[in-house]
Design a protein with these regions (language model features):
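Transmembrane alpha-helix/helix-exit interface in multi-pass inner-membrane proteins
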Residues: 107-121
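Interfacial segments of alpha-helical transmembrane regions
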Residues: 13-21, 80-109
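Hydrophobic alpha-helical transmembrane segments
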Residues: 15-19, 68-92, 97-102, 146-152, 156, 167-174, ...
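Divalent metal-coordination and catalytic microenvironments
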Residues: 46, 67, 114, 141, ...
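N-terminal transmembrane-helix/juxtamembrane module of multi-pass inner/ER membrane proteins
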Residues: 1-76, 117-129
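Membrane-helix interface segments
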Residues: 59, 92-97, 124, 162-168
Length: 228
């Protein structure tokens, strides 16, 4: 169903959000790359504080590992995205389905590319409570969660979801992103700046993708249809 174009203001907000997140991401990236002393000190302080607690709380560690390895795992998020893409394609929204899939893929490429480029080491412990491989910055778990939740929130808004549904989804999205960010630092496999970078980069990818889509398609803010 075609409706009047999306007003310029929402498109402008998306673009501004994307540019702000991109700029902050770039600043953080540079600070991490040059190992800016105040940031490194903050990362170390937070990591050591949480690790001291983690080694004395095996039950809480187990809960966090279940959450990070199953509930908020990147592959769980990718499966959720794939289900949404298939549903959109099945409903005939093939451009939108492709756009969501491409955005998710782009986020993964950006994430892996930056990990390789920065090559930041993860925290190392004599008594680790969990382990992870490859470079630390940005956090893949967090960036994938932000992109997945962000895309779902965008789709709900795009299809005119009821306010109660949209706000409920927003609460779940915030809990998911904050939750996975906490688990990664608490389990000692990421620095605080890694998860902040994941949030900023994920937000930048989603906002800029949505802004470009809105500009190219002139899609309405709400069509009265469900995204699923």
């Amino acid at each position: 169903m075609h409706s009047p174009p999306l007003p310029p203001r929402p498109r402008a907000r998306l673009l501004i959000t994307g540019l702000v997140c991109s700029s902050l991401s770039l600043v953080l990236l540079v600070l991490v790359a040059v190992r800016w002393s105040p940031l490194m000190s903050l990362d170390t302080t937070v990591a050591e504080s949480l690790h001291r607690d983690a080694v004395t709380e095996p039950g809480l560690v187990h809960v966090n590992r279940v959450l990070t390895d199953w509930v908020w795992d990147p592959w769980t998020m990718r499966v959720l995205t794939a289900v949404v893409v298939i549903a959109l394609w099945w409903r005939g929204s093939r451009l939108l389905a492709g756009w969501v899939a491409a955005t998710s893929l782009l986020a993964t490429l950006v994430q892996q590319g930056l990990k390789a480029a920065v090559g930041r080491e993860r925290p190392r412990w004599l008594d680790p409570v969990d382990s992870a491989h490859y470079a630390a910055f940005p956090s893949g778990h967090v960036m994938t969660a932000v992109v997945t939740c962000g895309l779902l929130m965008w789709l709900l808004r795009l299809h005119g979801a009821q306010q109660a549904l949209w706000w409920g989804a927003l609460v779940l999205a915030v809990i998911s992103v904050a939750g996975v960010a906490f688990t990664r630092v608490y389990l000692g496999v990421h620095w605080l700046s890694d998860v902040v970078g994941g949030v900023l980069l994920g937000g930048a990818v989603v906002a800029l993708s949505a802004a470009v889509y809105a500009q190219r398609t002139r899609w309405p803010a709400g069509t009265g249809e469900s995204p699923l």
